[in-house]
Swiss-Prot record:
Its EC number is 3.1.-.-. It is found in: Cytoplasm. InterPro entries: MetalPrtase_cat_dom_sf_prd, YbeY, YbeY_CS. Residues 147-157 have a biased composition (Acidic residues). Single strand-specific metallo-endoribonuclease involved in late-stage 70S ribosome quality control and in maturation of the 3' terminus of the 16S rRNA. GO terms for molecular function: metalloendopeptidase activity; RNA endonuclease activity; zinc ion binding. This is Endoribonuclease YbeY. The keyword Cell inner membrane does not apply. It comes from Pseudomonas putida (strain ATCC 700007 / DSM 6899 / JCM 31910 / BCRC 17059 / LMG 24140 / F1). Binds 1 zinc ion. Belongs to the endoribonuclease YbeY family. Residues 136-157 are annotated as: Disordered. It comes from the Bacteria.
Length: 157
């Protein structure tokens, strides 16, 4: 079972809790253990501040993943970590890339969850594995390949 804490630190429209949960559970289903995580939905100012603090980049990015660094045996429920998603960036990217807002939200939540599970896209081989899994999961939701018409990775972090 997933214990999901959803924090809305913005007045902008955001997906419903049920949708966020569905996308997380889909991405995390390979993990058999109970898990706990947080999704914080932020405005551009907070997104920029966090990206600057943790990545030394002076702009808001779409999703930041903060995997927990606590041994599972020390917790009642294993803590996966936190996702911080900048609502304005998600909306802007979806419009610029001609994607539905729901498909882009689903992609970024799944992408962030995979980071919490240890997936990465720094090396080409790792990126191919991660993107392949993202495509598969999004197809299950009926969403198109997020990388199909994109010569560059749409994930900006």
């Amino acid at each position: 079972m997933l214990e999901l804490d959803i924090q809305r630190a913005t007045d902008a429209a955001t997906p419903e809790d049920a949708a966020l949960r569905r996308w997380c559970e889909l991405a995390l289903r390979q993990r058999s253990a109970d898990s706990e995580m947080t999704i914080r939905l932020v405005d551009e100012a907070e997104g920029r501040e966090l990206n600057h603090t943790y990545r030394h980049k002076d702009y808001a990015t779409n999703v930041l993943s903060f995997p927990a660094d606590v041994p599972d045996e020390l917790l009642d429920i294993p803590l996966l970590g936190d996702l911080v998603i900048c609502v304005a960036v998600v909306e802007r990217e979806a419009a610029e890339q001609g994607k539905s807002l729901e498909a882009h939200w689903a992609h970024l939540v799944i992408h962030g969850c995979l980071h919490l599970l240890g997936y990465d896209h720094i090396e080409d081989e790792e990126a191919e594995e991660m993107e392949s899994l993202e495509r598969e999961l999004l197809a299950e939701l009926g969403h198109p390949d997020p990388y199909a018409d994109d010569e560059t990775d749409s994930i900006t972090h």
